[in-house]
Amino acid sequence: MDTVLKCLPSNPDDHCSQRCRLGPKAMALIGAKVGFPVLVSLQSGSCLCTAWPRRDLCDGFVQADYMCSTSHKPMAVFKDTGICLNQIKSMASTKLRKVSVKVVVRSLDVKRATSEAALLETVRDLLRNVFVLNDYVLSVNADSPVVHIEILDTDPATSNAGLITGKTSIVIKEVITLEWYKHKLQEAPQLKVAAMDDTCASLKEIIHMPLHYPETMHKLGLPCPKGVLLIGPPGVGKTLLVKAVAREVGAYVIGLSGPAIHGSRPGESEENLRKIFEKAREAACSGPALLFIDEVDALCPKRGHSNSAPENRVVAQLLTLMDGIDSDNKMVTVAATSRPDAIDPALRRPGRFDREVIIGTPTHKQRQAILEMMISNMPTDRDVDAAALADVTVGYVGADLTALCRDAAMQAVLQASLDSLCNLVSRAHFYEAFKRIRPSSARSSIGRVEFKPVHWEHIGGLEDIKHKLRQSIEWPMKYPEAFSRMGLTPPKGVLLYGPPGCAKTTLVKAVATSCHCSFFSISAADLFSPYVGDSEKTLAQVSNRCSDKRGLALQPLFSLMKLMPWWGPDQKVEQDLGSRKGSFLFSLMSWMA
């Protein structure tokens, strides 16, 4: 039984015949009869065939047709390797009364053009006198509109090979296109998303309902959300999050980017946009589909500029396409941006992007979780502590932490090339990487972020001021439930005043360190501008940065207080309220309100 048979290509006449041609000696050894089922088992899967003698009656060879197998692809391993005779086993057969199948057609046009009765008759002809097993896939002739037929269930349920006869009842449970079927069979890499459990759960909840239960929401009279807008700084993991959620809910992802849309001739951009939406609609006819628009602010900027007619047409086309999405269709549009204020406001109304999910800069615990996940895949020394690295990586997003770990590994490789004894990534390698990898927030032109932690013990004296700062800032952030239970409203702002050098800035850094928040330092030169409306715009950007990063923004108030003499006496302040200084003051008060 250890005889090795050489695999040869099947005869052209045996294509889609389910025949496995063997020599007479091999058929006698396995006890197979002509036309009876045999199971060919391999490491990559198995194939169900019928035993037939070779025409030349030569032993030592096998020619198998791969019509019915556990894989949707022909088993290429047969073509260039040999198999042992004990891998071919004769099977008993049972006539089936009923069989449930899933049909894979070539395209959506074929699916729409073929009626249910015609499709059922085609499947019946293809399955007549064919042996099948549960979860096996039949590959059909290339001339047929049906590409694959997957066996879902058989009656009676048996471990023997089931024979489909003319009396067998065939039930088509599902009809999908070939493109969707390939997508479902594609083995995507496992995506690990750390420190975004809450955001992932929120996004999954928004996407899961319209994709999998559109009929239920329609019966309840609730329109399904058509779009979700992800907002967050660059590198925080928006694209990775969308891919992970789509994989979890089983959605087909169609990507869309600005460079792939824009064309050189007039109207080409709108045409490309319509093609992508049509592709997403076709995918949604077979299963849940997710259209992902990355950097939507570059694709759909605000309209109204005289020199942006092509962009205005693209925005108008996108609005029309999103309005045309059927609420019963299993399709959701997800867009990502780091500049929500640059998007045309018409996109952000309900009915287009119904929900907005904000992803902020990782907190201390989130950075620690990200670092632990990355360090677990690296050969690190014992002195590498994720919590200690999280303390000194304030302002780092996921992409920054990935670059930091990669650079530390490169430092270890460089040292290993010089010293063969060094093969682990140590804490010194991470500190060396800190010199090269700066956080994304440090590259902003507005203000700066302080990264070196300052603890309360580093400040001598000032115990009364420390206690008041803890009461005003630290306690509301650490114990919000207690404040809510007692009906206390946390203060919205704190004003520190005093002579230069009395540790005002250091106290704010200590508060930010104890609360694990980012610290922004904005000077008067950053805020004020000679151009009308520029100062208010800068202040709005600072406000958005503080909201995204959950940080403390106390230093801007301190900087502004030093500008009070520049505003002039009290009577001059009243005269300046109509000027840009007064406009800036009103913007500041609106932000603090």
Curated annotation (Swiss-Prot):
Reactions that this protein is recorded to catalyse: ATP + H2O = ADP + phosphate + H(+)
GO cellular component: cytoplasm; nucleus; spindle
Extent of the signal sequence: none
InterPro entries in the cross-refs: AAA+_ATPase, AAA_ATPase_domain, AAA_lid_3, ATPase_AAA_core, ATPase_AAA_CS, P-loop_NTPase
Subunit structure, interactors included: Part of the 55LCC heterohexameric ATPase complex. Associates with pre-60S ribosomal particles.
Family designation: Belongs to the AAA ATPase family. AFG2 subfamily.
Record function comment: ATP-dependent chaperone part of the 55LCC heterohexameric ATPase complex which is chromatin-associated and promotes replisome proteostasis to maintain replication fork progression and genome stability. Required for replication fork progression, sister chromatid cohesion, and chromosome stability. The ATPase activity is specifically enhanced by replication fork DNA and is coupled to cysteine protease-dependent cleavage of replisome substrates in response to replication fork damage.
Protein name, as recorded: ATPase family gene 2 protein homolog B
Gene: afg2b
